[in-house]
C-alpha cells in the first residue's frame, strides 16, 4: 500500500505505484525538548524567528531552553515567552555545577532553593515544563522532589554527581539526563552520573551532530540504552545561518564549519542542528524505526503528550507539515 496526498494532507491509501506522493518519509512531527534558538535569534530576543526556523525543519512541538542568567533577567525572559507558540520553557540553569557549566556563565550559577524556584514557577504561570539540576548541589534533592510533585520534568545534567547522588536524584523524581555524555563525566567513568544513567531507566538526551559525542561512544550508548534515547538539537542562534560571531547569554561564541564554541576555547556552545538533521543522522546510524522513536515518541513520553497529533512529510530534506 502507499499514501495518497493532496494539498499537503493525507487523503487516503492506494495501491503501490498509484500514489501521487513522492515523499521519502511520512512521520510524526518532531518534538524538541532542548533548543535555544535559530535563524540568528534566541527565543528570548526573537521568538517568532527561532520558532519558524525550526518549524520549517519539521519541529511540531518546541520547548525553549534558557541558559543561566541573573534571576531578574530570567524572570523577564520567562514572562516574554510564556504566551509564545511554544509548548513551554526549560530552565537549563542556574542550578548546575561550576565544574561542568559548559556555555553557562559560571558567575551566575546558584544553589537550588525551593522558595526561589516557587517564585520562578509563579512567574511562568504554568509555562515552565522542565528544569535541569545538578543533583550534587546542596538542596538539589529537595528541589527535585518539589518540582516532580508539581508535574515539572526534572533533568539532571551539567553535573559532577557520583553514583549515589544520581540514584537519589532518580528516587526524588528525575527522569531525564540533559545532553548525555556532555557536561558530565564521560561514559566509562566509574562512580559517576554516566555509569548510573546507562544502567537505569532515565531518558538520555543525545546531540548527534558528529561533535558532541564521539562515534564510538554513540554506538556504545545506543547499544546499552536503545529505547531511552531522546534526540535534541540544543540549537543556538546560528542554526540556519552562516559561520561567524554570536553570543550565548553574555558569552561570546564563534561558529566555524557549523560548530559553535565559546570564543577562544574548545568548549562546545550548543549545536546548529535542526530536528530534521537529527532525524536523518539517527536514521543513518540506527535506522528508521528508532529515529522516529527518538525524535517523536520518546520526547512525547517525557512530556506526557500524544506523539501522533501531527505529521510531516520529508523529501530531499524539504519538510511539509501534513
Annotate each predicted stretch with a short phrase:
Residues 29-31, 155, 231-232:
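Residue-level marker for buried hydrophobic side chains located in beta-strands
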Residues 51, 75-82, 117, 144, ...:
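Generic structural signal for well-ordered alpha-helices
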Residues 165-290, 295, 302-306:
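Active-site-adjacent C-terminal substructures of enzyme catalytic domains
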Residues 91, 99-192:
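Divalent metal-binding pocket/active-site signature
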Residues 36-40, 48-77, 85-97, 124-136, ...:
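Divalent metal-dependent hydrolysis catalytic cores, especially in the metallo-beta-lactamase
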Amino acid at each position: 500500500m502507499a499514501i495518497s496526498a493532496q494539498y499537503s494532507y493525507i487523503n487516503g491509501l492506494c495501491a503501490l505505484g498509484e500514489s501521487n506522493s513522492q515523499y521519502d518519509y511520512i512521520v510524526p512531527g518532531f518534538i524538541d525538548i532542548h533548543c535555544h534558538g535559530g535563524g540568528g535569534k534566541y527565543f528570548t530576543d526573537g521568538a517568532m524567528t527561532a520558532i519558524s526556523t525550526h518549524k520549517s525543519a519539521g519541529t511540531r512541538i518546541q520547548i525553549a531552553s534558557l541558559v543561566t542568567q541573573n534571576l531578574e533577567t530570567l524572570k523577564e525572559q520567562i514572562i516574554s515567552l510564556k504566551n509564545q507558540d511554544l509548548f513551554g520553557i526549560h530552565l537549563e540553569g542556574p542550578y548546575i555545577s561550576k565544574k561542568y557549566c559548559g556555555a553557562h556563565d559560571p558567575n551566575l550559577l546558584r544553589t537550588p532553593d525551593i522558595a526561589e524556584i516557587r517564585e520562578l514557577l509563579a512567574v511562568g504561570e504554568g509555562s515552565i515544563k522542565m528544569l535541569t539540576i545538578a543533583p550534587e548541589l546542596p538542596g538539589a534533592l529537595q528541589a527535585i522532589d518539589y518540582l516532580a510533585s508539581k508535574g515539572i520534568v526534572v533533568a539532571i545534567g551539567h553535573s559532577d554527581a557520583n553514583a549515589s547522588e544520581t540514584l537519589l536524584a532518580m528516587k526524588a523524581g528525575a527522569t531525564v539526563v540533559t545532553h548525555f555524555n556532555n557536561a558530565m563525566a564521560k561514559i566509562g567513568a566509574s562512580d559517576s552520573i554516566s555509569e548510573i544513567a546507562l544502567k537505569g531507566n532515565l531518558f538520555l538526551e543525545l546531540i548527534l551532530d558528529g561533535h558532541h559525542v564521539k562515534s564510538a561512544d554513540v554506538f556504545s550508548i545506543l547499544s546499552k540504552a536503545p529505547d531511552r534515547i531522546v534526540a535534541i538539537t540544543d540549537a543556538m542562534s546560528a542554526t540556519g545561518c552562516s559561520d561567524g560571531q554570536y553570543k550565548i547569554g553574555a558569552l561570546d561564541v564563534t561558529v566555524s564549519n557549523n560548530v559553535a564554541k565559546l570564543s577562544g576555547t574548545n568548549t562546545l556552545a550548543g549545536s546548529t542542528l535542526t530536528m530534521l538533521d537529527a532525524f536523518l543522522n539517527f536514521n543513518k546510524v540506527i535506522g528508521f524505526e528508532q529515529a522516529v522513536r527518538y525524535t517523536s515518541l520518546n520526547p512525547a513520553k517525557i512530556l506526557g503528550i500524544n506523539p501522533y497529533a501531527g505529521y510531516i512529510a520529508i523529501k530531499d530534506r524539504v519538510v511539509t507539515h501534513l
